[in-house]
From Swiss-Prot:
It comes from the Bacteria. Belongs to the YciB family. This is Inner membrane-spanning protein YciB. The chain crosses the membrane at residues 1-21, 23-43, 51-71, 77-97, 120-140, 150-170. Keywords: Cell inner membrane, Cell membrane, Membrane, Transmembrane, Transmembrane helix. It is a multi-pass membrane protein. GO terms for cellular component: plasma membrane. Its main location: membrane. It is found in: Cell inner membrane. InterPro entries: YciB. Plays a role in cell envelope biogenesis, maintenance of cell envelope integrity and membrane homeostasis.
Amino acid sequence: MKILFDFLPIVIFFVVYKMTGNIIIATAILIPATIIQVGFTWFKNRTIEKMHLVSLALVVLLGGATVLLGDGDFIKWKPTIVNGLFAIAFLGSQFIGDKNIIQRMMGDKLDLPFKVWRTLNLAWVGFFIVSGVTNLYVAFSYSEEIWVDFKLFGLLGMTIVFIILQGIYLSSHLQNKE
């Protein structure tokens, strides 16, 4: 259920764009939708994930520029910037602290060797880079409408495929441990 809630502003953006064909209007709706989403999360949990704060800041900054300047190119950069920041954070976690980000997130649930944790973390770094570059390619090589479709379905599809592949990789190491 949480994943659906996380995607709600993107879905709203998509629906408004499909109804109006106007990225400026869709972005103008995305901004308050994201603010409401983060506000609701804070009200419900009294905490906000860093990912949501980064996304909110970029939606307000790049979405605001899109609306104020009437230029949809600004909002098209958001997925690439988010993915770039995640790639930097995950890569940096390889060198800072005892555990990388993936191990911090999943280490209490899975007992894996350091090499596997490192491979998983670096795979995420690669995924974030590929996602960010692919977003830029689609955003600036294809029509706006194609990019809007890609933003919802393409990036989500890439993420699902990557998680499945990661699960297959993990299962082979979990079976070897038994």
